[in-house]
Amino acid sequence: MLVPKRVKHRREFRGKMRGEAKGGKTIAFGEYGLEAVESHWITNRQIEAARIAMTRFMKRGGKVWIRIFPQKSYTAKGVGVRMGSGKGAPAGWVAVVKRGKIMFEIGGVSEDVAREALRLASNKLPIKTKFVKKSSEVGGESNEG
């Protein structure tokens, strides 16, 4: 499971998720990727479930790159605890994913295998996603479907 080794502050503000992702919008490592169409928090358990779904389908072929990391903590109070008396204890870790961010990449497999593996991974995530290919021309838009 992905968790930070150490953090400066255990309890963070929730923050806003306005606009698009600033970086990580292009495929850098593999040939195919899974792009977020909407913004959302993705928990470390969801990332792990998506990774397992992809690697199980691909068996021993290809390579998977995870481009997001859960570095934000979220807090929760216990069930039946009354309001007030401070912020709750850290309950887990999330990755803040904005629209346009490439979350997972796959390389070394055919397009059909990559498409199905990323579809299985997207079923484990709480957001809408789309399958993207690395553009063949450098600096140009891909004109294939």
Curated annotation (Swiss-Prot):
Record GO biological process: translation
Example of a GO cellular component annotation carried by this entry: cytosolic large ribosomal subunit
Pfam families named among the record's database cross-references: Ribosomal_L16 (PF00252)
SUPFAM superfamilies (alphabetical): Ribosomal protein L16p/L10e
Domain of life, per lineage: Bacteria
GO MF: rRNA binding; structural constituent of ribosome; tRNA binding
Disulfide bridges in this chain: none
InterPro entries the record matches: Ribosomal_uL16 (IPR047873), Ribosomal_uL16_bact-type (IPR000114), Ribosomal_uL16_CS (IPR020798), Ribosomal_uL16_dom (IPR016180), Ribosomal_uL16_sf (IPR036920)
Keyword RNA-binding in annotation: yes
Keywords for this protein: Ribonucleoprotein, Ribosomal protein, RNA-binding, rRNA-binding, tRNA-binding
Membership in a protein family: Belongs to the universal ribosomal protein uL16 family.
Function comment: Binds 23S rRNA and is also seen to make contacts with the A and possibly P site tRNAs.
Subunit structure: Part of the 50S ribosomal subunit.
NCBIfam families (alphabetical): rplP_bact (TIGR01164)
Protein name: Large ribosomal subunit protein uL16
Species this chain originates from: Lactobacillus johnsonii (strain CNCM I-12250 / La1 / NCC 533)
Phylogenetic classification of the source organism: Bacteria, Bacillati, Bacillota, Bacilli, Lactobacillales
